[in-house]
Amino acid sequence: MFEYRGQYTINEAHVLNLFQNLRADLEQLSLASYFAQVAEVLSQEDYPTPDLQSLLLNCLYGLSNLKQPLDQVKAVFELRAACLSGYTPDLFGCHVCGSQTPDRFDLSSGLLECQNCRDASSGGIRLPVTPGILEAMRFICFCDPKKLFSFRLNQPELHRLSQVTEGFLTTQLERSFSALDYYKSLRLNHEEMEST
């Protein structure tokens, strides 16, 4: 790599991992593309983001080699990427009464609340969270990066977790992602084919 007039040019590189298994599954490939789009949005030129790069590589590896459930890898990437970029939600309890078992998550504020504590006049979308989902969110935000995939939820809760993390990330970034839309259309088609 060399610099010329303030521009850096890479003149040689070596591939460490091609993630070849991703090419065999269109859903995995579209999810990997979504991760790349998010990483591009969260990265700034001339500011290294090694933690985000490591998260991206670990999630690509999780998709390609570990065969983790897609909803789990997606949720891990979305929530941890948000945290690494300064959008860490407050997951310590209801922001009104302090209860450790709130059942709603506000996508705009990143705060938890109990159903009874909700202020009807306040705006924002609140999604229901179970104790298992809440514990998984806390784990993703605060665990050692090497243990990101070492939590377990049943498939319906993993799917709900994925919806919550997606809603939180896209709300915080105030944008949508074309690769995410494509991934969701593939999942919908896949689910329709399985139900027939």
What positions do the PLM features span?
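Non-catalytic alpha-helical scaffolds and adjoining flexible linkers that form interface surfaces
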Residues: 1-196
